[in-house]
Amino acid sequence: MKIPLTPIRFLRYAREQFPNKVGVVCGDQRFTYLQFAERAARLAGALVARRAQPGDRIAILSTNCHRLLEAYYGILGAGCILLPLNIRLAPQELAFVLNDAQARFLFVERPFLPLAQSFQTTVPSLEITFLLDGQPEADWLAAQNYDNLLAGGPPFECDFTQVDEDSIAELFYTSGSSDRPKGVMLTHRNVYLHALSVLAAGQTSPTTLGEMSCTSVLLHTIPLFHANGWGTAHTITVVGGTHVMIHHFNPIDVFRLMDRERVTTCAMVPTMVAALTHSLERANYDLSSLRTIVIGGAASSPTLVKEAQEKLGCACISGYGLTETSPTLAKSAMKAGLAWEGDQRYASQAMAGFAIPGVELRVLGPDGKEVPHDGSAIGEIVVRGDTIMQGYWRQPEATATAMRDGWFHTGDVATVNACNYIQIVDRKKEIIVSGGENISSLEVEKVLSAHPSVYEAAVIPVPDAKWGEVPKALVVLKPGMKATENELLEFCRARLSHYKCPRSVDFPESLPKTGTGKVLKRELRRQYWAAEKGVVS
C-alpha cells in the first residue's frame, strides 16, 4: 500500500494523538492540537468556498503568529501552494515576488496594510486580500477579516490519499542577497521527508542534542518565512511538541517567553545568539529549561558557541542547509565514538557538521572529484536526496545550472575532515582572490570575532592596483568597548597567514542585514567597488 507523503498528515496525526495538549502559544492565546487543526481545516474550507484552485499560489505577509502557522496547513489542505513573504523586502521586491508567483490571494498582518494596498495596482493577479488582525471596516474596506473567514463556513477535511506528493506544497523565494530572488519549489514529499530526516538526525548523537519529542517546547525566534524558521514547523507538530510564537526578536521578550513557557529549544542566527549572550537582562529570568540552541543561517564561531554555552547554560550546535534543500543538510552534534573536549569540541560544534539521514553530501574539487578528507582541501558542496527542491519557479536555466549530473550544487565552498564533518569556507562567489591566492572571508571573520571588543565583523574584497583585490574588515564593536584599526590588524597577523589578513578596518555602527540577520555583503561591496565596472556580485 502506498499513501502519498504530505505534511498535511502531520497535523492530522497530532490532532488524533494529542488532541488536548497545548500545541500553539501566541501571546496570551493557547490552542490545543484539536483547536489548531480545526482552525487550519476551517481556513482550507474558506479557501475552497472562494473557489481556490489546486496549485493556486496563496501569499502571506506576517510576522510569526498562530495564524501564519495555521496557513502552513490550511493552504495545503485546500490544495494550494503556500507562498510566505519576507517582511523585510522593499515594496518593489515584494511586488516582484507576487507577480513572479502570480499569487491569487494575500493574507496580510495589519502593520503591512499600506503595502497590501499598493499591490492592488502593481500586482494584477491578486483577487482577494485577507486581514489577519484588525477590522477591515476601520483599516481597509477592500480587505476581508481572517477570523470572520474561519467562522463563516464548515471545515474542509482534505483527503490526503489523493494528494500528489510530487506536486508543489511550498514556494519560498531566496533572500536575494546576491541577485534577484528565485522561487524555490518544494514538494509535499520534500517537506514530509525533511521533517522525518531531522527527527532521525536528533538520534545520531549520544547526547541527543537537537532531539525533538512530545516534551519539546520550541520558541520560533526565526521568522517562518525564512528557511531556518519553517524548517522546524512540521517537525515539532508531528511529535506533538509545543510551538511558541514571537512576533519580533528582542532579547528581553525572548528571555521572558523562555522563562514563562519553559522553552527547551530554538533556532537562531549568530547575531541573535550574540545579542542574548551580551544582554544583562538574562540574569532576571529562569532559563534552566533551555536544552539546545541550533545556530544556522550564517557561519558560527567557536568563540560564540563557548560564550553562549557558558552564559545561557545550554548546548549550542550548528545546522547547515539552504532554502533549496528544505532546508537542513547537516548538524554538528558530536557523533558516537568521538571524545572531543575543550576548544576542539567548541570548534566542532561551530562547524556545519555531518550529513543528516537521507542526505548524500560530497565536497568536489575543480576536477569534479571528491577532495581528500583532510580538513584542508577545499571544494564545492554538492548534495542529493529526497529533500532537494523540484527546481526554481519558471527558471529552467537556473534550475539546470544548479542541478547537474544528479546533484544539487550549493555554491558553498568547504573542507571535510576524517570524521566527515564539513567546515564551510565561504560562498563560492565570495572567496577573495588576492594575487592568485584564495582567501576565505569566513576564516578571517572568525578570527576577528575572537577579539574581546568585537561584536560582529564582515570581511569583503576591495580593489587593489597591485593584487587585484585585498580583504577589508568592517567591524562593529561591543557597547562601551574600544579597539583601533592597528590593534585589530595586529590581532589578525598573530593568528593568520600574512596574505589573509585585512589590509584595513572600518568601524560602522551596524552592518546591513537580511530579515534573518545575514549580513548583506553585496551592499558592503557596492560601497567600495562603486568606481569599478561590473564587479558587484
Where are these regions (language model features)?
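Conserved beta-loop-beta connector loops within the AMP-binding
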Residues: 358-382, 416-419, 481-485, 520
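Gly/Ser/Thr-rich phosphate-binding loop
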Residues: 238, 260-268, 278-347, 360, ...
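Structural core segment of the AMP-binding/adenylate-forming
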Residues: 49-50, 77-148, 479-481
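Conserved AMP-binding/adenylate-forming core of the ANL superfamily
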Residues: 3, 20-65, 69-73, 90-95, ...
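Conserved AMP-binding/adenylation subdomain of ANL enzymes
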Residues: 192-217, 225-264, 279
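Conserved AMP-binding A3 loop
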Residues: 32-34, 169-197
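Conserved pre-ATP/AMP-binding loop-to-beta segment of ANL
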Residues: 19, 131, 136, 151-173, ...
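AMP-binding/adenylate-forming catalytic core of the ANL superfamily
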Residues: 89, 106-108, 258, 266, ...
